[in-house]
């Protein structure tokens, strides 16, 4: 999104809490070399607890205060901790209704009433997923332009914001390893077909060529996931050039097709068909392993 490559709405905002953040700073790094598996597990649990405390005691109240200041009212919206997040590190901003009708091509649920009984794929809330186990490098500062600010720049001159975001090559490898893990049996969750689309779009912009020149970056992504997001089914040991698996098997493909169809309202322009997407992913797998 930060590089203008993904042409769809996002279902969430992923935020990595830096090692120098309050509460996080006091924990020992789980990725440190030379420590035992038990010590790594202990440190990971401590880091998770610190991240939970950071979200609940620092990020949550600051966000709620900032939103109230911006909206000028306490009515029609709320900020809550996501009850469905088992890690207790996600905040939901359920925003007030602005429009009385759906915005063509921008999702049938957009502008839906706050607290409405029915919701589409795009829900009337902003989901902020925090975490401290991910890595923040390599990164660079990028300017984020909201869609409305792009359409009405004179009316929203202060809407642009510079954020530190992961390099696009690292993002590519993060996506590729998700597809690899799904091929090998990692549990498929709702809304995961987006990762196939994102990977295709990154490759279409030539990011695959740039990333392939950085196999060490792929290795870093794999190491982080192996230690911080352990999954016995993911086969991270084979997630390297030559043995990457991106194209899904028939059973997984059928489930992805249904999810991709449901995802259609996230796109602002007609997306590629599911068959076109799968063809592109298969070609990318061959290219990366060649």
What would you call each of these model-derived segments?
Residues 3-8, 13, 18-290:
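Structured mid-to-C-terminal alpha-helical surface segments
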